[in-house]
Each structure stands twice: as structure tokens, then as C-alpha cells.
Amino acid sequence: MSTEQELQIGKVVKSHGIRGEVVVELSTDDPDIRFAIGEVLNGKQAGKEHSLTIDAARMHQGRLLVKFAEVPDRTAADSLRGTRFFAAPLEDEDDEDGFYDHELEGLRVIHEGEDIGEVTGVMHGPAGEILEVRLTSGKETLIPFVHAIVPEVDLEEGTATITPPEGLLDL
């Protein structure tokens, strides 16, 4: 299965400790399923692919720490930095009202009928998602991904229409 059909479920941010654990930034709502002990993850990093078996996974200070069977120490864990993990969608991830990050990235941002920029990324926070947008002026801005501000996303047209409150684009 190619990554076009797969979803990114996490990314190695850094190593943790001396026993080969890594900190994983999650991009899945199902970490208990995706990062269960014994699961084999498909990782991609700078053109290289890894198959890694989860030995242990635990939450620590709000972050997921994962120990892979193939990673014996900190040096090996350091080499995984930037590795992105992909997996096929779970049945319940076919939410018609939701969007995957890769579907939003690259969308043209429309305000009052004008193309004002492009979605360059999606940030996930405790209060919800935020679109990272590069305006046509070259300036970067953040737009909360809530229906009141982003009332329409048209994947076929490749656009996200926004109705920002006054001043949001001036920040």
C-alpha cells in the first residue's frame, strides 16, 4: 500500500533516555490501537523505509514514548528522528465530516472570492486544529479550523473558504 492511501499516524520527534525510547508526535485519534504492543509500524525517513515492532508504549508528561524491539539504545533512537509512521485507515476513520492533514495541505485559501494563500500545514492542539497558511504576500498566519471561520472546504476544487473575524489576518 502506498502512502497516498495510508494515513500518517505519528512522527518521531526525538529520543528519550538511554534505553532507546523515542518521543512520538501523534496524528491519530487511536493511539491505543495504532501503537499497541506487538504492532509493526511502517516508517519512512528521508527516502528510507523501516519496519519497527513496538515493544512498549506509554504516556509520559503528555507525550507518547515508544520502545521498538529493533532499537537497543539512544544512538539507534537518535537515528530515527524525523521518521513518519503510516498505516491504512481504520474503518471508523472514514468520517465524512472530518479531513486528514494531507487533504488540507495545499488547498487554496479563499476570502471574499479572492485567493489569499495556501494551507501549508495543520497543527493539532488541545483546543482543536489550526491551519498554517502562507498568504500570497509571503506572510505566514494561523487560522483556527472551526466551522465559524472555515465554513467550506471543497476538496474537488482544492479550496478552503474562510470568513475570519476582523483583524485575524492582520496578526
Curated annotation (Swiss-Prot):
The keyword rRNA processing applies. The keyword rRNA processing applies. GO terms for molecular function: ribosome binding. It is found in: Cytoplasm. Residues 96-168 form the PRC barrel domain. Its main location: cytoplasm. InterPro entries: PRC_barrel-like_sf, PRC_RimM, RimM, RimM_N, RimM_N_sf, Transl_B-barrel_sf. Keywords: Chaperone, Cytoplasm, Ribosome biogenesis, rRNA processing. GO terms for cellular component: cytoplasm; ribosome. Gene3D superfamilies: PRC-barrel domain, RimM. One of its GO terms (biological process) is ribosomal small subunit biogenesis. Belongs to the RimM family. This is Ribosome maturation factor RimM. It comes from Corynebacterium glutamicum (strain ATCC 13032 / DSM 20300 / JCM 1318 / BCRC 11384 / CCUG 27702 / LMG 3730 / NBRC 12168 / NCIMB 10025 / NRRL B-2784 / 534).
